[in-house]
């Protein structure tokens, strides 16, 4: 007798449930998506004990006809596709016909539904077995209740997390759906307490305000672009509003929320040097395309997709974001306090430099006043950064925290915890007392971010503090400038161009510099010798596991040549495959930091003025290459308010 047998339907559904129904959030996702596919304009979600005890979804959609009710709970039964061609033209959120039978097989399920033109149907299913079916009076739409989830699979139940965690997973899913479909009114309740209410008026910014707070909504930059194959719309926050997790970026493809790392990476690339390392924006991006260009039949939960023209899409996203930021003055408002935000965030976190050849740039430098001693340098094709004069030490000594730029800037080591989004501020919570109408009014009153160019306004220096910060003013108020970050940006744009166009101008080292490597590192570097010449690293093999450097580009920061070579080699060794574009970027950032003014370095008025004028000529005068702000702004009104001149 053969050993292979066909499994019965109930066991097959239990196995399928293991893929489709991982936790209560999976149930909520599948049922709410079914409601949206049924043309619902209003959906209510009621939870008890984070859905482990009870999940109830009520919608005003098309409903299910009586003759379809039983069929709907059979495996691979669906109204959304008919043949294999439909699989490549999917516009609905569901299409496999697996969700309902999988959910019913591991729960006690009750369904009341009506199409509106006939009596409704009442259906009770327990563990996949139909217990009751009868006609009933019902309004148009569907009311489905799932109780005692995983009652017959105790092993699965044992691996559920705390109620708080499971509720977080559900709110995360509901928030993404709300952003994906702002035309649908969504209400989310937990133990009879309202957690979310969206109006369904189609305004995604209002949904974002409901989820992230009105303060975040005020910092949103609209994004919109179109190509032959793609249309993208959405909002991203100004660079000053960041989080420690990518989880606050939502990508929507043809109305479906998807998790796609390359799309998130494209959003990050759109910010290029505007964000600190390890920080991420809040963003929502909706992408419309021909269904033939995207494969959604990849993941059981339909969260992962594959694109046919991925590189074209990524380029469109990057260029659209970069173009948007070039129209905005990205000076953060110093009047905004961030202490509370950081505290809130710790809770929520559960939850190519190939330019066309321009004219040869001159090395940015700070002009020394006449009469100052200046060290004579050997004549070079490109002049190195001038050493800034520093006065004798004063009695006052700066706090140790100010002397911080001697090393390359490093991001905070605060651990990043990837968890679902949690609300920053619930506009519909009972204790807050906010109503949906009030939120709508708040959103309507938000002023659009001005997009009339990102040129730095003229600044008139008035002093320096602690040898680190420059104070300047204009008719709009007071500006505080980090002098190290400012010159770092100037130097970065200079070195970025130089590293991208390695010239024949090299300088011989008096003593060749030897680099010893392990065998693995040596072999990895040996493969990339020709590529490394493109970034100014000229290596000659010396022995079995060593290289020597006899010369370097003239634009290497003077006195730091060997240090630059060492750090560039470290970058090469760390990368399994050398990405020249990335290596050029890292090299430019590293050299710009080392060649810039340090903290506790006093400048004359002429030097300060020259620094600010040089900063104004950069393409991005608002952040250093590491993404830290260069300057912050106190408006005249804020200052008057601080001194009680206005109330």
UniProtKB/Swiss-Prot annotation:
One GO CC annotation: mismatch repair complex
GO molecular function annotations of the record: ATP binding; ATP hydrolysis activity; ATP-dependent DNA damage sensor activity; mismatched DNA binding
Keyword DNA repair: yes
InterPro entries, A to Z: DNA_mismatch_repair_CS, DNA_mismatch_repair_MutL, DNA_mismatch_S5_2-like, HATPase_C_sf, MutL/Mlh/PMS, MutL/Mlh/Pms-like, MutL_C, MutL_C_dimsub
Signal peptide: none
Gene3D superfamilies attached to this UniProt entry: 3.30.230.10, Histidine kinase-like ATPase, C-terminal domain, MutL, C-terminal domain, dimerisation subdomain, MutL, C-terminal domain, regulatory subdomain
Keyword DNA repair: yes
GO biological process: mismatch repair
Disulfide bonds: none
Keywords, sorted A to Z: DNA damage, DNA repair
Function: This protein is involved in the repair of mismatches in DNA. It is required for dam-dependent methyl-directed DNA mismatch repair. May act as a 'molecular matchmaker', a protein that promotes the formation of a stable complex between two or more DNA-binding proteins in an ATP-dependent manner without itself being part of a final effector complex.
Family to which the UniProt record says this protein belongs: Belongs to the DNA mismatch repair MutL/HexB family.
Protein name: DNA mismatch repair protein MutL
Species the sequence originates in: Bacillus thuringiensis (strain Al Hakam)
């Amino acid at each position: 007798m053969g050993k292979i047998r066909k499994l019965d339907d109930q066991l097959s559904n239990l196995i399928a449930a293991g893929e489709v129904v991982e936790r209560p959030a999976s149930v909520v996702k599948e049922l709410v998506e079914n409601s949206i596919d049924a043309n619902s304009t209003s959906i209510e979600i009621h939870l008890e004990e984070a859905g482990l005890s009870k999940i109830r979804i009520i919608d005003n959609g098309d409903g299910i006809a009586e003759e379809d009710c039983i069929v709907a709970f059979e495996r691979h039964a669906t109204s959304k596709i008919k043949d294999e061609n439909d699989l490549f033209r999917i516009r609905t959120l569901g299409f496999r016909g697996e969700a309902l039978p999988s959910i019913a097989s591991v729960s006690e399920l009750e369904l009341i539904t009506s199409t509106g033109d006939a009596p409704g149907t009442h259906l009770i299913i327990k563990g996949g077995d139909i217990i009751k079916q009868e006609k009933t009076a019902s309004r148009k739409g569907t009311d489905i209740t799932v109780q005692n989830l995983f009652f017959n699979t105790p092993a699965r139940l044992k691996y559920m997390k705390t109620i708080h965690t499971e509720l977080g997973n559900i709110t995360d899913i509901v928030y993404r759906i709300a952003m994906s479909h702002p035309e649908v009114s969504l209400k989310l309740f937990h133990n009879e307490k309202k957690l979310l209410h969206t109006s369904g008026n189609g305004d995604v910014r209002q949904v974002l305000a409901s989820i992230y707070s009105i303060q975040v909504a005020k910092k949103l930059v609209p994004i919109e672009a179109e190509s032959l194959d793609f249309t993208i719309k959405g909002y991203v926050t100004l660079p000053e509003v960041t989080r420690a997790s990518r989880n606050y970026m939502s990508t929507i493809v043809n109305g479906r929320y998807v998790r796609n790392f390359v799309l998130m990476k494209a959003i990050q690339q759109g910010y290029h040097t505007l964000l600190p390392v390890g920080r991420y924006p809040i963003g929502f991006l909706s992408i419309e395309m021909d269904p033939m260009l995207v494969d959604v039949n990849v993941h059981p939960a339909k969260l992962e997709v594959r694109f046919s023209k991925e590189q074209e899409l990524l380029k469109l996203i990057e260029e659209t974001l970069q173009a948007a930021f070039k129209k905005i003055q990205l000076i953060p408002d110093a009047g905004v306090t961030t202490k509370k935000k950081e505290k809130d965030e710790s809770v929520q976190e559960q939850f190519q430099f190939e330019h066309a050849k321009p004219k040869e740039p001159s090395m940015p430098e700070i002009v020394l006043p006449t009469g100052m001693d200046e060290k004579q340098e050997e004549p070079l094709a490109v002049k190195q950064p001038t050493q800034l004069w520093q006065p004798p030490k004063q009695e006052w000594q700066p706090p140790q925290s100010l002397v911080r730029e001697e090393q390359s800037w490093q991001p905070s080591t605060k651990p990043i915890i990837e968890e679902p989004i949690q609300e920053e501020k619930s506009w519909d919570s009972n204790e807050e007392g906010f109503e949906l109408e009030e939120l709508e009014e708040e959103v309507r009153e938000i002023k659009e971010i001005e997009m009339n160019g990102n040129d730095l306004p003229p600044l008139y220096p008035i002093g320096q503090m602690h040898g680190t910060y420059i104070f300047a003013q204009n008719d709009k108020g007071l500006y505080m400038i980090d002098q190290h970050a400012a010159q770092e940006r100037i130097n970065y744009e200079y070195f970025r161009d130089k590293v991208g166009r390695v010239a024949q101008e090299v300088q011989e080292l008096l003593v060749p510099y030897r680099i010893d490597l392990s065998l693995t590192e040596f072999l990895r570097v040996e493969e990339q010798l020709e590529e490394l010449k493109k970034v100014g690293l000229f290596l000659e093999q010396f022995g079995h596991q060593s290289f020597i450097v006899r010369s370097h580009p003239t634009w290497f920061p003077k006195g730091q040549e060997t240090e630059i070579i060492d750090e560039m080699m470290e970058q090469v060794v760390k990368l399994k495959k050398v990405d020249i574009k990335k290596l050029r970027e890292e090299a430019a950032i590293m050299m710009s930091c080392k060649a810039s003014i340090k903290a506790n370095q006093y400048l004359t008025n002429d030097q300060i003025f020259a620094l600010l004028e040089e900063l104004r000529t950069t393409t991005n005068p608002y952040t250093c290459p590491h993404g830290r702000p260069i300057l912050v702004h106190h408006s005249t009104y804020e200052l008057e308010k601080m001194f009680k001149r206005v109330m």
